[in-house]
Amino acid sequence: MNLTKVWNTTLGSLQVQLPRHEYNTWVRGANLLDIDNGVAIIRAPNAFIKEGLESRYLTTLREQLGSVVGFPVDVRIVLATSESERIDGASINGRHAARDTRKSDHHAPLSGGYGNGISHPLERASVHQLELHRAVRSSMLNPRYTFDRFIIGPSNRLANAACMAVAEHPAQAYNPLFLYGGVGLGKTHLLHAIGNFVLDRDPEVNVLYVSSETFTNDLINSIRRQQTEEFRIRYRNIDILLIDDIQFIAGKEQTQEEFFHTFNTLHSAGKQIIISSDRSPKAILTLEERLRSRFEWGLIVDVQMPDLETRTAILRAKAEQSPVPVPQPVIDFLAQRIQSHIRELEGCLNRVTAYAQMYNIPVTIEVATAALSELLDTNRRKRVTPEAILREVAAFYSVDLRSLQGRGRSRNIVTPRHVAMYLLREETDSSLMEIGQLLGGRDHTTVMYGCDKIAEEINTDARLRQEVAAIRERLMNSAV
């Protein structure tokens, strides 16, 4: 039985099931030691956590572990007894520290003395130090960020394929692999997915995920404390380096100097390097040319904004974890209206479900509109004009614009006209009377009827819902 996989799966379920503050306070620091004769041994990092798990979460742990392993288990909580156990127990994914060390070339200069060419051999480092560093490394990977949980679409298909290739064949496919794109598009998810994939296949591989800010802070602290050898142990005795937001080292000379030598050491030793940034290497101003050229040695892939189908798939996957049911019409509505990055998509869905829970009401399009009123008002004002709506509706349904605005009531014109009424009410500040004037001088009660009819039917008519979504997408893409 793979205890690492069992515990990671259990933690993933608990992270979805429990409120975030409860998960972080009580569960995150625990670690599965063994399952023997139907008893799961879970290690708590301190007595406070041990007591909390025993008094609050034994039943939940039994249920979740039993569900994962496929048979009933009892749970026993034990206390970590040493510093190394406490650090290991604090790891998010509960992976055990690797037992062997891998040697590589460690020749870069460091300050204190920085830049003096003096090398501090890693061979003098104690096994205990290496074990502690490995335990801390594993804590930096989020077990929920896996390839299985990554929603693939045209905007990120190449990036996903490149990351999978690197995970399956480290230092053979693309080295370095450089991912770039705007915030909230899944770059960090892919970095974690690589690390989790590699460690699931071989827990002995030394994987380190850090942000460039952490790298810089570690460097500064090591120089101040005269612990540059510790810094080398952390960053150069690894097999895979995953470094996030590399753009933040721009303009920091010492950090760039040290990362240059770290890069060279790892690359020359055949170790895999994966880097993310919010822009391409050429667009990172004040980045040293020697670093820029090294970033371009391997493969550079951009991650783009998700399209409508990908946004819908992301929201659908997120909705499956929601504490309240989220109907498909609401998912479609959010995917149409929130056309930014993935974090905002997920944040909006969380806000809608929280709003519904707070008022103890089901999730509907009306509830979503109320919960996101400020955001939707801001996003909507991409200056969609009434004239643009009428043109898009007429073009979509292949009807004459004059007929759409006229008094005729033929069957092929009634539905497009009602859709136009609905979109004019939803996407502009036009009053019902103004909408009526645009559509053949109709009164406000007729407009209200048409709007309400479409609002009701899109909840049950999938075809109509798709038609309205397509028109909205065209409007948003053409808005200035």
From Swiss-Prot:
* Claim: Electron transport is one of the keywords in the record: no
- Stretches for region Disordered: 91-115
Q: Which residue stretches belong to region Domain III, AAA+ region?
A: 140-356
Q: Where is the composition biased (Basic and acidic residues)?
A: 97-108
Record-linked InterPro entries:
AAA+_ATPase, Chromosome_initiator_DnaA, Chromosome_initiator_DnaA-like, Chromosome_initiator_DnaA_CS, DnaA_C, DnaA_dom, DnaA_N_dom, DnaA_N_sf
Gene Ontology cellular component annotations, sorted alphabetically: cytoplasm; plasma membrane
Which residues make up the binding site for ATP? 184, 186-188
Q: Which UniProt keywords apply?
A: ATP-binding, Cytoplasm, DNA replication, DNA-binding, Lipid-binding, Nucleotide-binding
What does the record say about domains? Domain I is involved in oligomerization and binding regulators, domain II is flexibile and of varying length in different bacteria, domain III forms the AAA+ region, while domain IV binds dsDNA.
Protein name, per record: Chromosomal replication initiator protein DnaA
Which species is listed as the source? Roseiflexus castenholzii (strain DSM 13941 / HLO8)
Q: Output the lineage of the source organism.
A: Bacteria, Bacillati, Chloroflexota, Chloroflexia, Chloroflexales
